Amino acid sequence: MANLTTLAVSTRAKAGKGAARATRREGLVPAVIYGGKQEPSIIALDPRVIMKELHRGGWSSRVYNLAAEGAEPVAALIRDVQLHPVTDAPIHVDFQRVAAGTKVHVEVSIAFVGEEKSPGIKRGGVLNVVRHYVDVQADPANIPEHFTAELSGLDIHDNVRWTDLKGTEGVVLGSGQAADMVIASIAAPTIDAEMEAEAAAKAAAEAEAAAKPGAKKK
């Protein structure tokens, strides 16, 4: 697994709520690494590092290299980030160990490109995104950061399906998802509600004026 994003972490001696609170008082985020048929490892990391990854996007399918001083690096996925209910600051992170040659479930995001070239959108159609993510199984060495949906050739009423996505080589759809499932579509243009209401009001006013005694007929 080459080109992993490295995150600097520190080991923690104790687990539990009290130890986690103490870690937060030190300005760090408590975290755990589980899986791989090993005992969980209790770690901590800089909250700015996690926030950077959350804002970067694609973190749910990105394999990280967790590097602690004096320990072997660990390849892992972020499985859960708990956020403070008021500040949205990260307060705990769950990592899962991964190894090449195994299959893991991940949610991979979809990047939509070519919207400005779509004939349907040029004619007033609207992009209707059904899925922003797809659940797949993949070897950690082959997890894409995103799939690509090409919109440049789509007209009104055309769809993008799983089989149309680029970057799906080497991955398998998660259970319960069909290969012909719709990812996005170009919907027909709709009449602006305000314009429609204004036209109706104008027509009603003209009809009322025409019905008044003495009104001139055109």
From Swiss-Prot:
Highest taxon listed in the record's lineage = Bacteria
Stretches that traverse the bilayer: none
Print the keywords alphabetically: Ribonucleoprotein, Ribosomal protein, RNA-binding, rRNA-binding
Q: Which GO terms describe its molecular function?
A: 5S rRNA binding; structural constituent of ribosome
Record's Pfam families? Ribosomal_L25p (PF01386), Ribosomal_TL5_C (PF14693)
**Which proteins does it associate with, and in what oligomeric form?**
Part of the 50S ribosomal subunit; part of the 5S rRNA/L5/L18/L25 subcomplex. Contacts the 5S rRNA. Binds to the 5S rRNA independently of L5 and L18.
Per its record, how is this protein called by name?
Large ribosomal subunit protein bL25
Q: Which gene encodes it?
A: rplY
